[in-house]
């Protein structure tokens, strides 16, 4: 990664999305 801040922010956002989709699988099933 060229920019550490951007890389970290990207990974953090992905992790947050995963964490948010896990407990709400029944609400939005199949939606990314």
Curated annotation (Swiss-Prot):
GO terms for molecular function: hormone activity. One of its GO terms (cellular component) is extracellular region. Signal peptide: none annotated. Its main location: secreted. InterPro entries: Calcitonin (IPR021118), Calcitonin/adrenomedullin (IPR021116), Calcitonin_CS (IPR018360), Calcitonin_peptide-like (IPR001693). The lineage of its organism: Eukaryota, Metazoa, Chordata, Craniata, Vertebrata. This is Calcitonin. Keywords: Amidation, Disulfide bond, Hormone, Secreted. PROSITE patterns: CALCITONIN (PS00258). It holds the Pfam family Calc_CGRP_IAPP. Causes a rapid but short-lived drop in the level of calcium and phosphate in blood by promoting the incorporation of those ions in the bones. Coiled coil: none annotated. Disulfide bonds join 1-7. It comes from Anguilla japonica.
